[in-house]
Amino acid sequence: MTTEKVNLLDFDRKGLRTFFAEELGEKAFRAEQVMKWIYHFGCDDFDQMNNINKQLREKLKAKCEIRAPYVSEAQHSADGTIKWAMRVGDQDVETVYIPEDDRATLCVSSQVGCALECKFCSTAQQGFNRNLRVSEIIGQVWRAAREIGLEKETGRRPITNVVMMGMGEPLLNMKNLIPALEIMLDDLGFGLSKRRVTVSTSGVVSGLEQMIGQIDVALAISLHAPNDKLRSEIMPINDRWNIEAFLEVVRRYIASSNANRGKVTVEYVLLDHVNDGTEHAHELAELLKRTPCKINLIPFNPYPGSPYKKPSNSRIDRFQKTLMQYEHTVTIRKTRGDDIDAACGQLVGDVIDRTKRTKAKQFDGQAIPVKTL
């Protein structure tokens, strides 16, 4: 019987030190040496770790591995965006690299599919299978960094920002999300600033409450409607945690956070003649008066079979100007990678649906059908 090897990408620094001490009988500083090799040098070969003694290298080869998701397909957009299908087990999740003049952002998935069934999101139409492991979340960053590193001659910018805005709801995978975030921030990991790592949530209040005092990163919230009636129609999670409950915990999180500089990013997808009217803009502006924020408007990105359309430029412009009358900071997200279906709301991957779509989801606490790892 073959014993499965331990994937070292599943450990943050604390977990790796504990594993080295308790399972390998090694001093904790050895764990930090190995961690530096993994994340600073993109190394997955123990034999290349030349400051590690041979005895430990042999022990690591016998018991451990460094295994990130691999790229099963890559698509390149005309604007420089790259979408990778990353193989996790027998399925794919999607990871998107978005280069800009002064930064390069990586959009990372947290689940295989999504159980929340937001009506405007193509990921939701794929159903839900399971949570990603720590190694499968941080492994997307590791693999992407390595892919970019292999293409230095093209002048691609190294990853400077990570956004948890890919497939899935991050706060329904807290067990694996937090260690992955810790590795992103750790000096021995990717060493990113807390202001350059963003978690986006559709409103999992219990998860956001757990984050308070536990991890400090930038926060973006998927609001997408100015009132509970409309939000429940397009985002069923609102039936479990309504807007008032959501914004209350958001205010508490940003009050405890240094990463957010006192403001949360409010994401609002504009759906033609659904939530993009002037009356919706006035209602949204009033709703957010007590929540320090900047508002990011996202014109809808169509996908095959979608019942919604992108609003006209005049409707988008009018919505923005109405919000600005209330002295809100309002931006319109530039669509990137839409020619390869890599834009916001277009990610689908390859998902074996484990949810029963003929039955309504019951948002009782976090009693959503989530297979944990």
Curated annotation (Swiss-Prot):
Segments forming domain Radical SAM core: 100-339
Tell me which Gene3D superfamilies the record gives: 1.10.150.530, Aldolase class I
Q: What is its main location?
A: cytoplasm
Matching SUPFAM superfamilies, A to Z?
Radical SAM enzymes
InterPro entries in the record, alphabetically? Aldolase_TIM, Methyltransferase_A, RlmN_N, RNA_MTrfase_RlmN, rRNA_lsu_MTrfase_RlmN/Cfr, rSAM
BP GO annotations: rRNA base methylation; tRNA methylation
UniProt: S-adenosyl-L-methionine binding residues: G168, E169, S200, S222, L223, H224, N301
So what EC number does this one have? 2.1.1.192
Q: Where does [4Fe-4S] cluster bind?
A: C114, C118, C121
On whether Transport is a keyword of this UniProt record, the answer is no
Which keywords label this protein?
4Fe-4S, Cytoplasm, Disulfide bond, Iron, Iron-sulfur, Metal-binding, Methyltransferase, rRNA processing, S-adenosyl-L-methionine, Transferase, tRNA processing
Q: Which GO terms describe its molecular function?
A: 4 iron, 4 sulfur cluster binding; metal ion binding; rRNA (adenine(2503)-C2-)-methyltransferase activity; rRNA binding; tRNA (adenine(37)-C2)-methyltransferase activity; tRNA binding
Q: Which cysteines are joined by disulfide bonds?
A: C107-C344
The active site lies at: E94 (proton acceptor), C344 (s-methylcysteine intermediate)
Cofactor dependence is on: [4Fe-4S] cluster
Entry GO CC: cytoplasm
Per its record, the protein catalyses: adenosine(2503) in 23S rRNA + 2 reduced [2Fe-2S]-[ferredoxin] + 2 S-adenosyl-L-methionine = 2-methyladenosine(2503) in 23S rRNA + 5'-deoxyadenosine + L-methionine + 2 oxidized [2Fe-2S]-[ferredoxin] + S-adenosyl-L-homocysteine; adenosine(37) in tRNA + 2 reduced [2Fe-2S]-[ferredoxin] + 2 S-adenosyl-L-methionine = 2-methyladenosine(37) in tRNA + 5'-deoxyadenosine + L-methionine + 2 oxidized [2Fe-2S]-[ferredoxin] + S-adenosyl-L-homocysteine
Where in or outside the cell is it found?
Cytoplasm
Q: Which Pfam families match?
A: Radical_SAM, RlmN_N
**Superkingdom classification of source:** Bacteria
* Cofactor info, note text: Binds 1 [4Fe-4S] cluster. The cluster is coordinated with 3 cysteines and an exchangeable S-adenosyl-L-methionine.
What exactly does this protein do? Answer: Specifically methylates position 2 of adenine 2503 in 23S rRNA and position 2 of adenine 37 in tRNAs. m2A2503 modification seems to play a crucial role in the proofreading step occurring at the peptidyl transferase center and thus would serve to optimize ribosomal fidelity.
Entry's family note: Belongs to the radical SAM superfamily. RlmN family.
**Extra notes?**
Reaction proceeds by a ping-pong mechanism involving intermediate methylation of a conserved cysteine residue.
NCBIfam families in alphabetical order: PRK11194.1 (NF008396), rRNA_mod_RlmN (TIGR00048)
Question: What name does UniProt use for this protein?
Answer: Dual-specificity RNA methyltransferase RlmN
Give the gene that encodes this protein. Answer: rlmN
